[in-house]
């Protein structure tokens, strides 16, 4: 019922000897993720939490058959880390790093597309398939295995919605934090299609926010391609135009990207929009009864 990662995922951690990399490598391994290695130039032969360290992604893949990488490196080096992962044979790259220059993100995303590699992020919390695998920085205790897909532009609101879903008895198939920057990898349409194609996923929770037109495009995509129940929450409903709210991509500009416009787009195609995150489970259950 999961997408992108599962119990067979073989994960490496780029930047594993750094503070964030080592901390989250330990947490992911503790959760049960198959963390098979990490990279840090010049530190091959070391171990972090019992995880072997390699100089390069190519070396790590050759030794461990890793297929997924998560990146914890400073923003100026994130593009090179993504390119190295793509060239090294990784099929799914998750970039946690915040503050990646936009042109660096554009270059990395373009190269990934050319090479057929999937990317999550940058500036994202990663993803989790509960009780199977977690590649990210998410608080695992709130998640429960189930049949609802979760797609979110917001990190902390993901956790709030997931907590509400779990409390309502709606476990999650996979929860994906797509990232809050203007340029990121997999987005609403691609992930909605993956959940649509996954036979055991029966519903979707989508968390959007102000800025850009991703939610408007998602609404049209749902109308044309998605038959499973979807419930939506849009953050930033009180945000003033021109002021950045948290993420680099969360800004209303040129008279577009407001919460009201996004809410209207979903309601126009029959997708219910929650005014509070706590309403998401009820909206999904109402649709599943039809």
Sequence positions of predicted segments:
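Catalytic-core regions of core metabolic enzymes
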Residues: 1-290
């Amino acid at each position: 019922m999961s997408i992108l990662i599962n119990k067979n995922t073989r994960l490496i951690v780029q930047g594993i000897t750094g503070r964030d990399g080592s901390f989250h490598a330990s947490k992911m391994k503790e959760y049960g993720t198959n963390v098979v290695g990490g990279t840090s130039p010049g530190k091959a032969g070391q171990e972090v939490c019992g995880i072997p360290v390699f100089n390069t992604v190519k070396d790590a893949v050759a030794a461990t058959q890793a297929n997924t990488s998560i990146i914890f490196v400073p923003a100026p080096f994130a593009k090179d880390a993504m390119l190295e992962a793509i060239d090294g044979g990784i099929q799914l790259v998750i970039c946690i790093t915040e503050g990646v220059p936009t042109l660096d993100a554009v270059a990395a995303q373009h190269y990934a597309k050319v090479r057929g590699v999937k990317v999550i992020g940058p500036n994202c919390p990663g993803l989790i398939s509960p009780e199977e695998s977690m590649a990210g920085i998410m608080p695992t205790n709130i998640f429960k295995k189930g049949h609802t897909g979760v797609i979110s532009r917001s990190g902390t609101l993901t956790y709030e919605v997931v907590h509400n879903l779990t409390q309502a008895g709606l476990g999650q198939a996979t929860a994906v934090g797509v990232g809050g920057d203007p340029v990121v990898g997999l987005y609403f349409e691609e992930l909605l299609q993956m959940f649509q194609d996954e036979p055991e996923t029966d519903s979707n929770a989508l968390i959007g926010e102000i800025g850009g037109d991703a939610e408007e495009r998602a609404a049209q995509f749902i109308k044309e391609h998605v038959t499973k129940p979807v419930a939506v929450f849009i953050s930033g409903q009180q945000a003033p135009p021109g002021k950045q709210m948290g993420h680099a991509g969360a800004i209303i500009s040129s008279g577009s990207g407001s919460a009201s416009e996004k809410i209207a787009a979903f309601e126009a195609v029959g997708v219910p929009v929650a005014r509070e995150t706590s309403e998401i489970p009820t909206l999904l259950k109402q649709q599943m009864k039809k």
